[in-house]
Design a protein with these regions (language model features):
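Sec-dependent signal peptide recognition
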Residues: 2-8
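C-terminal motif of bacterial Sec signal peptides marking the signal peptidase cleavage site
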Residues: 14-17
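Bacterial signal peptide processing site
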Residues: 19-21
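Short, glycine-/small- and polar/acidic-enriched structural segments
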Residues: 24-158, 167-175, 180, 191-196
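Pocket-lining segment of extracytoplasmic ligand-binding domains
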Residues: 84-85, 163-261
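Short, solvent-exposed loop/beta-turn-alpha elements that line the ligand-binding surface or hinge
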Residues: 122-125, 201-216, 291-302
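Secondary-structure end/capping motifs
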Residues: 230-314
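Long, low-complexity C-terminal extensions of enzymes
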Residues: 318-326
């Protein structure tokens, strides 16, 4: 009888051990270690991804059209690009992505080089814009319908030397469409030929609210998730999005955290090479009432659909399609 009890106890122990082992195996199997491949513009949108500076799967690009091209090809799991550019790629080029969130809300400005004697922007002034047919161009034409752009350059980084010299192709430039944090850098660069005479002429977000009301907003850089990636790795994607939301909230309320991440990454030159700006500029724009208008609006938020549709009804109503939201 004693031997039977020992055998029964041993059997229970073995079964229990097997169950634990099986549980451990299942837990290990359920863990998803998939690494997201991410691409974003430099400058303002990249501020939201400072925790990914050392991630080899995170890529930045200075030209939004290059990012849209990658989106159409489906090369990345996560694409950060302007709202209009991304939705156009989905609607017109069948890019297999969905809109997950919006992270900047109008960081465009007009910079006066000081060359215009009356400092009143008019149709005969020489005006330079970046991103032809993209968000800055569309917004400028909407906000200033009677004033045209004379010259276009590819990205906002191409605007900086023009704004600081006040010239393009040896001709005087009167006004530049620019974005924060590039504007901060231009205004504070003592080596710029326009230093001391150049100034912020107009804030697109303020102008927008003047026309459409204080509750309305420009919608800028947005996060798009590849359909296949979300289907196969939804937990990884949701974790990523939650982390970005938390990080942005931290950077806006505690700019020193953003500064610390950049300074730990490398020298000012290395920082600028990675995301187009450095910790000094980050400090300036985040502490200056968050002039890059960094924030987070999720496609799961109750106000998302109405906010996006209100904006698109003004700039491009053909892009409205709830099926394109995550």
């Amino acid at each position: 009888m004693k031997n039977k009890l020992i055998s029964l106890t041993l059997l229970i122990t073995l079964i229990s051990g097997c169950n634990k082992s099986s549980s451990n195996i299942n837990s290990s199997e359920n863990k998803d270690d998939y690494k997201l491949k991410i691409i974003s513009p430099t400058e303002a949108p990249a501020v939201g991804l400072l925790n990914y500076l050392n991630d080899k799967n995170y890529e930045t690009n200075t030209v939004p059209n290059n990012i849209v091209a990658e989106m159409i090809k489906g090369t990345h799991d996560v694409v950060i690009v302007d709202l209009i550019g991304g939705l156009t790629a989905i609607n017109k080029k069948s890019a297999q992505y969905k809109l997950a969130s919006i992270i900047t809300f109008g960081n465009f400005y007009i910079y006066s080089t000081g060359n215009d004697s009356n400092n009143i922007m008019e149709s005969d002034d020489n005006i330079v814009c970046f991103g032809q047919n993209n968000t800055p161009d569309i917004l400028f034409n909407h906000l200033y319908p009677n004033i045209g752009v004379d010259t276009y350059v590819a990205g906002v980084s191409d605007i900086a030397p023009i704004a600081m010299s006040g010239k393009i192709n040896n001709e005087n430039v009167d006004y530049c469409i620019i974005a924060e944090p590039v504007l901060f850098n231009v205004l504070n660069n003592k080596n710029a030929l326009t230093y001391g005479k150049g100034s912020e002429y107009s804030n697109f977000q303020a102008k927008w609210k003047e026309i459409h009301g204080n509750e309305s907003s420009i919608l800028g850089a947005s996060i798009y998730i590849k359909n296949e990636t979300y289907q196969n790795h939804s937990n990884v994607v949701n974790s990523f999005l939650n982390n970005i939301k938390s990080d942005i909230n931290t950077y806006v309320n505690n700019p020193e955290k953003a500064i610390e991440l950049l300074d730990n990454y490398g020298s000012k030159e290395e920082q600028a090479q990675r995301i187009g700006l450095n910790s000094t500029i980050i400090k300036g724009v985040l502490e200056d009432s968050n002039s890059i208008n960094l924030g987070y609006l999720s496609s799961k938020d109750s106000s998302f659909n109405s906010t996006v549709e209100e904006y698109l009804n003004v700039v491009n109503s053909t892009l409205i399609n709830k099926n394109n939201y995550l």
